[in-house]
Design a protein with these regions (language model features):
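N-terminal leader/targeting and pre-domain segments
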Residues: 1-19, 95-108
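Thiol-based oxidoreductase modules, predominantly thioredoxin-like and allied folds used
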Residues: 2-5, 23-25, 43, 47-62
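Short pre-active-site segment immediately N-terminal to redox-active cysteine/selenocysteine motifs
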Residues: 17, 24-29
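Structural micro-motif
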Residues: 18, 67-77
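The canonical Cys-X-X-Cys-His
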Residues: 28-31, 75
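Typically the conserved alpha-helix immediately C-terminal to a functionally engaged Cys/Sec
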Residues: 30-46
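Non-catalytic, surface beta->alpha helical segment in thiol-disulfide oxidoreductase systems
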Residues: 76-108
């Protein structure tokens, strides 16, 4: 999982057909660990078809503001460089959501 900045997010989103970006903050250590684990599990299976990134909302607030998230942790899902949805909460099935994104189905 790559740590993203405003400077590299464009290439990151265009590099593969799908992407998941975990938005978090260091002060939310418990939820951060749970979501990172879900991201790592999904990355093991889908790394050839999807990119996995992370944004620390405190370190890069401008990038965090560019995505419609209202709380951390959140995961934003992209298809062909375009945002298709963002979900709040640590207990997400990132793999399932990315598989839906890759098929062209909506996430829920």
């Amino acid at each position: 999982m790559r740590v993203l900045t405003q400077a590299d997010i464009g290439f990151f989103l265009e590099e593969k057909p799908a992407a998941a970006i975990h938005f978090d903050a260091k002060w939310d250590a418990t939820h951060r660990a749970v979501t990172r684990s879900a991201m790592a599990d999904a990355e093991q299976v889908l790394a050839e078809r999807a990119n996995f990134g992370e944004v620390d909302c405190d370190s890069d607030p401008e990038l965090a503001k560019s995505i419609p998230i209202i709380n951390v942790p959140s995961v934003a899902y992209y298809r062909d460089g375009k945002l298709v949805g963002a979900l709040i909460g640590a207990n997400q099935d990132v793999r399932l959501h990315l598989e839906r994104v890759l098929r062209g189905d909506p996430i829920r």
